[in-house]
Amino acid sequence: KNDVRQWMEWGMDYLKYDWNPNDVYHVTEMHDALRSHNRDVVFSLSNSAPWGDAIQWERLANCWRTTGDIKDTWESMSRLGFNQTKWAPFVGPGHWIDPDMLVVGMVGWGPKLHYTRLTPDEQYTHISLWALLSSPLLIGCDMAQLDDFTLSLLTNDEVIEVNQDPMGKQGIVIAEQGNIVTYAKPLEDGSMAVGLFNRGNTMAKGTLTWKSVGIRGEQTVR
C-alpha cells in the first residue's frame, strides 16, 4: 500500500507487475491497492499468467502476459502469436491478452542493439496478427532509430483501427489448410477483419468463403 501511495503521488498510470507475482492472492492485493485510489492505472501482469486462472486475470487485470519473453525470430514470434485462441472468451474492453511486445526495428538489450531478424513479410505477419488479437501494441524498439519501414508498420492507421475497435473482440482461428491459417475478428460496425497467414517456409495458396468467415451477401473487400 505504501508503494502504491507513492506511485499515485508521482502520477503513475501504468503498472507492469513483473516476474511472476501472478498468483491470484498477490494479484488481488495489488488490484485492490490500486483501486483504492481515485486514479486510472493500467494494471499489467507479467509474465506467463497461468491459464487455469484466466477468469481471475480477466477480473483483476487490464492485460496479462500469456507467454514468456518474445525473441525477434520467426520461430519465437509465430509460436507465441499463433497460440492465443483459447484466451478469446476472457478478452474484452479493458481486459486484454499480451503475447509480449512488438519486435520490429532496432531491438535488443543495452547499447548494442540490432535490427530485427524478422524478414519484412514476417514483420507484416507480426503486426497484423497482434492487431487481430486485440493485444496491446507495445513498441519494443529504439524509437530514436526508427527507419521508414518500421515507422510505416507502427503507424498504419487501418491496422491500428482494427486493433482498437471498440467492440474489443479477439480474433480467433476459423480455418486451417495445411500451413495456411485464417483468423477473423468481428468489428463494431458489423464488418469482419480477416487475416490469412502462411506459417510455412514456401509459397502456398489459401481460400475462404463468406460462410466460413460468418458473413453473407455482397461485401466490400478492402
What are these model-derived regions, one by one?
Residues 1-9:
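Short, acidic/polar
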Residues 10-14, 37-42, 61, 189-192:
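Loop/turn elements at helix/coil->beta-strand transitions in domains of secreted/extracellular proteins
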Residues 12-20, 45, 66, 196:
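Conserved beta-strand positions
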Residues 124, 130-133, 138-140, 176-215:
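Carbohydrate-binding surface patches
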Residues 125-176:
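Catalytic cores of secreted or luminal carbohydrate-active enzymes
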